Each structure stands twice: as C-alpha cells, then as structure tokens.
Amino acid sequence: LHAAREMGVSVGPGRGSAAGSAVAFCLRITDIDPIKYGLLFERFLNSGRISMPDIDIDFDEDGREAVLKYVVNKYGHDKVAHIITFGSMAAKMAIRDVARVQKLPLQDADRLAKLVPERPGITLAQAFAEVPELAKERESSNKLIAQTLKYAAVLEGSVRQTGVHACGIIIGKDALDNYIPLCTAKDTELYATQYDGSHVESVGLLKMDFLGLKTLSIIKDAVINIKKSRGIEIDIETLPLDDKKTFDLFSNGETTAIFQFESTGMKRYLRDLKPNRLEDLIAMNALYRPGPME
C-alpha cells in the first residue's frame, strides 16, 4: 500500500471487516479509526475463524494493474498468480448446449430453455416439477427433444468454462508450483492457480484481494481536472467531513454519480431523512439493503 501511494495510485480508505482492526489502522492498511466509529474487531478476526482474515483493498482501475506489476517485480513472477474460477452449466445453458450438439433446431431449443423458470439457481429437477409442459417433453415423440432433456439433466452442474477471480491474487514465499498446479490464463501474463479460492486457502496459501474500483478512478480524474481547470489542488484525505453545502446536496437527493447513493430509491430516502452528519450517511448506507429494508 505504501508503494501504491508512492506511485500515485488511489487507495480506498478501507473495505469490509479489516476496518475493524486497530493494527490495520495504525499500519495505514486502512484509514478508518475503528475506535472512533465503534467497529467490531471480531468481524475481522475471532476464535471461531479457521481461515486467514480477509483484507480487501480498493485501487483505482489503472492503479490496480500498476500494483500487480509492482508485486510481480518485488516477489517474482513464479510467486504470484491469479485464482481460477469455474463456471458450471446451469439449467437453461445445459439445454442449449446439448441441443446444439444434438443438432436440435434452434426454435425447439429456445422453446425448451424458455420453459425453465427465470430464477437464479433453479435446477432442471425443480423445473420439471414446477412446469408440467416441460416435464411432458421428456416423453416427446421427437427423439431429439427427449434426448436433449435427458442429457441436459446429466450434464447440469458440470464445469463449462474457467476464468480468473476478479480481484483474488495469491502471493507465495516460494515458487507456487511447489504447492499447487498452475496454468496460463487468457488476457494476462500471470499464471492462474488450478485450484479455486477455497482450496487454495486450505493448502495454506495467502489470498489477497486487490479490487479495481471505478469510483476511485472517477475521484482521481476529478481531482486532476479541477487542478487543470481551476488551479485548485485538492487533498482527498484532508477534506472536512462536516461541510454544510455537501450535506445540503445529500439532503436534496442531488447524488448522481455518488457511490452507493445514486439510486432512485436512495435519493428518495435522502430527501425524506435529511442527513446532516457523516454518521447519518453511514447508517443510511448500512440500512439501505435487502435484508434491513425487509
């Protein structure tokens, strides 16, 4: 993080449970005082937790690549890798993939796939139970249709493609191939692990989460443009947190492009609740989520 700041990379003040650690604050891993804001250390680390605690770090989008290059140069190309992800075959995709191999006409494949209810995580077994029309197609006189549904049910849940984790990076003290199998990955010079995140951690390797956050890029560009156009140099880290004009904008719902405050629903609640201090915004951001809203 020190190197990132030295390179001019925008670094987020703290994300997730790590903000509850006073040690992280003192080391400037985070910039949020957990004692001042009453944050819980136990969310970060407690006796019931077996795995290493997570420290998620936000960088501006371009800066994330610069930080990755720094890490590779510091620790070595053979000690740094992305984490592989596995994409499995869901119900609709299983039907479409099998239909393509079976050479089932596209219109029939579309019709079968559209009979599966639009619900995340639904399985073909559930779809057959809920949609009699789809279940009936398993006994279709058209052999291709019946076989497509039969084979789709067998292949459902199989790994269909691989990718790399959006932010997870493994850094080892020795060459990673001493501990886990590696592979090349598309669109990156780094290796990727052939174990996914949960297995990588069970082997004992440390996972770091480097996130590229568009909002930090926008703030960074805004600061640069203000300096160019107005000659005013703004230090984001020393901005006052009690500026009345800023809270007036929040109270009026004028928050377009403000991270997590730009939705129509949030703007409505801002106009209703009229926040006038930082703690009000913290509470609103925490509560405006599906669970608390219910």
Regions found by a protein language model. Name each.
Residues 1-294:
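Alpha-helical scaffold/interaction cores of sigma-54-like transcription cofactors
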